[in-house]
Regions:
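A generic structural signal for well-ordered alpha-helical segments enriched in polar/charged residues
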Residues: 81, 85, 251-254
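A short acidic/basic microdomain associated with nuclease active sites
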Residues: 85-124, 129-131
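Feature for intrinsically disordered/low-complexity regulatory segments and propeptides
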Residues: 1-80, 87-91, 98
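Intrinsically disordered, low-complexity regions enriched in serine/threonine
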Residues: 1-35, 113-316
Length: 316
């Protein structure tokens, strides 16, 4: 009795059980870090949907004759239609819309309500500035190891118009170029940009968009960008360029007029210098920097521009 050992019933039967028939291959679950979405413009902007612009925002008018402006939603839809028509047979994606500078108001019935008692139905809003990007991903090329998709960008800023007058042709900016898929930087070329597009209705806007698309030469634009990779600068030369860019703003007006315009701000120039050291895609700290990477350092810094100056600086 002293040698008696009581064993669980499961232990006695363990050798007779074929556990393999119930076993499954182990699945290793790895949590992928969520990377923040990259946008073609970032500074002081928020994402907006076309539905929001169409159904939840009011349309500003010219105050002297109460004539409607072409609102942001109509602008986006018109260019979207023009792109789908011109690039028939290609895949044209829906617009990525960014807005800024919200203008708030109230309906007449809520004029005398305290602000803390306002209902959502009492409020009105519209956005002073809007920009959008429409990609055509089936038209693409690789430059410097980066995939570039054809992209159309539109910009509208009510602050650049006089809404206190009678209705006049309205100002729009429209560009077609390529978007770097690594960083969403926009690459704009002179032939693909209209900086002073003035129209009175969406029909004229549609026609102007088709004209811009037709005049743009993507092959020439791509060739010029590919050539950038054939030229490099040393770290010393990069430092000289950054220093001269910083000096530009301090030059007397006469000196500035004798030089090409330089629209980047001091803050953006500082961003270029930081990206030269830290950027995982285009940084070249301690080695030569080719002009394609330098160009992308500049376009990356431009993403911090406000909407109304974004395209001008992209071209510059």
């Amino acid at each position: 009795m002293r040698n008696l050992v009581i064993m669980p019933a499961m232990a006695q039967n363990r050798e007779r059980m074929n556990l393999g028939e119930y076993a499954e291959e182990a699945t290793i679950i790895v949590d992928e870090p969520v990377r923040p979405a990259k946008h073609f413009i970032e500074a002081n902007t928020q994402e907006a949907t076309l539905h929001h612009l169409k159904h939840e925002c009011i349309t500003p008018v010219f105050s002297k004759d109460n004539e409607l402006t072409i609102n942001h939603a109509a602008f986006v839809e018109t260019i979207q239609d023009a792109a789908q028509s011109f690039f028939s047979g290609e895949r044209v994606e829906q617009a990525d819309i960014r807005v800024s500078h919200i203008i708030k108001g109230r309906i007449p019935e809520a004029i005398h309500k305290p602000a803390n008692q306002l209902l959502e139905s009492d409020k009105t809003i519209y956005y002073e500035r809007a920009a959008f990007s429409i990609d055509v991903p089936t038209i693409y090329e690789t430059v410097g190891g980066n995939k570039l998709n054809l992209s159309i960008v539109g910009v509208r800023a009510y602050n650049q118009m006089n809404l206190y007058s009678k209705k006049v042709p309205e100002l729009f900016r429209l560009a077609i170029g390529f978007k770097n898929q690594v960083c969403c930087n926009m690459c704009i070329f002179t032939d693909g940009y209209k900086d002073d597009l003035r129209v009175s209705n969406t029909t004229e806007l549609y026609r102007a968009a088709l004209e811009l698309f037709n005049n743009y030469n993507p092959a020439k634009h791509l060739h010029l960008m590919q050539q950038l990779g054939n030229t490099s600068m040393s770290e010393h030369q990069f430092a000289q360029i950054i220093g001269k860019m910083r000096l530009y703003q301090c030059l007397p007006t006469g000196y500035q007029k004798a030089l090409p315009r330089m629209l980047l701000t001091d803050t953006q120039i500082n961003s270029v210098a930081k990206a030269y050291i830290n950027d995982e895609n285009f940084g070249s700290f301690g080695s030569e920097l080719n002009m394609w990477k330098f160009y992308n350092l500049l376009t990356g810094a431009n993403k911090s521009s406000y909407i109304d100056s974004f395209l001008d600086r992209s071209l510059n």
